Amino acid sequence: MSKKIIIIDNSDLSYSGEDIDGTILRGTETSLILLSEQFHKMGFQIDYCNEIKEEKIVNGVRYFNKKNIDKTINYDLAIAVSDANQFARVTSLKKAIFSVSNQPLEKFLRKKQLIPFLKF
């Protein structure tokens, strides 16, 4: 049985691996799509959640809306993009935050991310 990984994007963007050569993706989204596809090649089951309207599978990665995350699924790893508050949406054995920017304490407090960061 393959391990299950979920990636939860905190942005309001709607995208999938089909958009990798388009204009809407930034570096973080592109990096995570490529990482997801590599994980799939290694035998992992990958769910990728953002604001996408319709579920689709692209290059082995299942994309669906983060509002439709099933908390009864126990993932082996949950990766949240920059916001530990996203972990409240999911059940997982391990959690990791993917952030490409510096998070000063002020920003953690302002965006109410400090407690979830320490909690998860």
Q: Which residues are covered by each model-predicted region?
A:
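N-terminal subdomain of nucleotide-sugar transferases
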Residues: 1-49
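Extended catalytic core of nucleotide-activated donor transferases of GT-like folds
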Residues: 50-120
